[in-house]
């Protein structure tokens, strides 16, 4: 995922100056790199420990599988094509993808029947209400911090003590990794972004780079307990306990931490593509 979401404040303004489009494009290269590294880790582990393999599929079987999943693959084309063609913004693309996924699930794959829709909507509403309650409190805390000028005071304090951008980014990574142990990703972004952004700007750190850095940290947080959402999803699929899965996931977690170090200190990994597309202006 490229991590193109933008946190909003109490009145709907962005908590940083980075747009959704900038963050979306800035996440493409880091996303491809991280996916490749995780894939390499998977292949290496499978080769080293001789994991069982499925029999090689024939071209007829591959074509059949491709034909069956073509409707799902079209979702990527609709989202990216619609954004690049200017048909809708990245935020609107999320709504379009939800409508498309609903249509495909009900009328094409028929995994979901019309009778199931009210139950699914009720479950989604319940989960959304819980998340929105958390986000509301996070936004209020962020608003209070901003209104009291605490970020600006912290920025001035750090500059007075000669803190450079490298030290600051190391601190940001530690802070976000610790927060990822006990909090949900959206809450962390809403609380920390308004505080960290003014300091980062004064230290010469591009807000888009900071945004991508936060997204990578959030992804790491989703892969370790106790709040790691990806662990619970994988546990349900693999029928493994959380403790057992936590031990098994360490090679991939280590890979993500190594990549986090790379993307932290090489800003061009995230800034090159949006700059090449003219989305960053003169920055």
What are the roles of these predicted feature ranges?
Residues 1-283:
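Alpha-helical transmembrane segments of multi-pass membrane transport proteins
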């Amino acid at each position: 995922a490229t991590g193109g979401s933008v946190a909003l404040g109490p009145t709907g303004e962005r908590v940083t100056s980075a747009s959704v489009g900038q963050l979306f494009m800035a996440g493409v290269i880091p996303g491809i790199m991280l996916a490749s590294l995780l894939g390499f880790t998977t292949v290496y582990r499978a080769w080293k420990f001789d994991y069982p393999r499925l029999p090689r599929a024939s071209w007829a079987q591959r074509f059949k599988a491709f034909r069956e999943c073509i409707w799902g693959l079209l979702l990527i084309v609709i989202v990216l094509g619609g954004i690049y063609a200017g048909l809708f913004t990245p935020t609107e693309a999320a709504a379009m993808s939800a409508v498309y996924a609903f249509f495909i699930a009900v009328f094409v794959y028929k995994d979901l029947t019309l009778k199931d829709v009210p139950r699914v909507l009720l479950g989604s509403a319940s989960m959304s209400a819980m998340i929105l309650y958390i986000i509301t409190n996070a936004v209020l805390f962020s608003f209070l911090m901003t209104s009291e000028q605490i970020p600006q005071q912290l920025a001035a304090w750090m500059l007075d003590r000669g803190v450079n951008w490298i030290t600051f980014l190391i601190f940001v990574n530690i802070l976000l990794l610790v927060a990822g142990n006990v909090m949900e990703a959206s809450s962390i972004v809403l609380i920390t972004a308004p505080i960290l952004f003014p300091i980062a700007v004064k230290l010469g750190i591009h807000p888009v780079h900071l945004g991508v850095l936060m997204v990578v940290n959030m992804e790491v947080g989703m892969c370790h307990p106790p709040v790691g959402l990806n662990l619970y999803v994988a546990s349900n699929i693999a029928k493994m306990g959380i403790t057992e899965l936590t031990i098994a996931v360490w090679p991939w977690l280590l890979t993500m931490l190594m990549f986090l170090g790379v993307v932290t200190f090489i800003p061009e990994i995230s800034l090159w593509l949006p700059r090449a597309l003219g989305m960053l202006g003169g920055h």
